[in-house]
From Swiss-Prot:
This is Calmodulin-like protein. Residues 21-56, 57-92, 93-128, 129-161 form the EF-hand domain. Ca(2+) 2 binds at D70, D72, N74, Q76, E81. Ca(2+) 4 binds at D142, D144, D146, E148, E153. SUPFAM superfamilies: EF-hand. Coiled coil: none annotated. GO terms for molecular function: calcium ion binding. Keywords: Calcium, Metal-binding, Repeat. Belongs to the calmodulin family. Ca(2+) 3 binds at D106, D108, N110, E117. The keyword Repeat applies.
Amino acid sequence: MAIPSNLMQFSEDIIKQLTPEEIDEFREAFMMFDKDGNGTISTKELGIAMRSLGQNPTEQEILEMINEVDIDGNGQIEFPEFCVMMKRMMKETDSEMIREAFRVFDKDGNGVITAQEFRYFMVHMGMQFSEEEVDEMIKEVDVDGDGEIDYEEFVKMMSNQ
């Protein structure tokens, strides 16, 4: 089966972005999942690994997970495909963490972080800033200039750290 070149390129781009530490961590996890040591993770091995992590996927869910990253279409996950899968999962976790952090800042739940909410959070985190400093921080991320931080502005701020 021919591999779509754009899918192959996308996977190569993701792998190039990995740090040496991420590659080491992923390789360690891959070797734990690859029970028979043949260099691939089968549906059976993925199922065992997921159950050991407290998940209980159906056979169909396992097949779907493999198919999402199975670049060469052989029904198994090789290390580069595993890296793509792990990086994708990390991105999803990051966005969940950003969403949760936004909820913490947005005390009244109205979808924006006011200067007052931002200041309240900073004080409760033990950070002492003057009114001017808080206003300056908000100005830096307040793209639309409304004096508040909306979700998109917050995501941009958190992503630029």
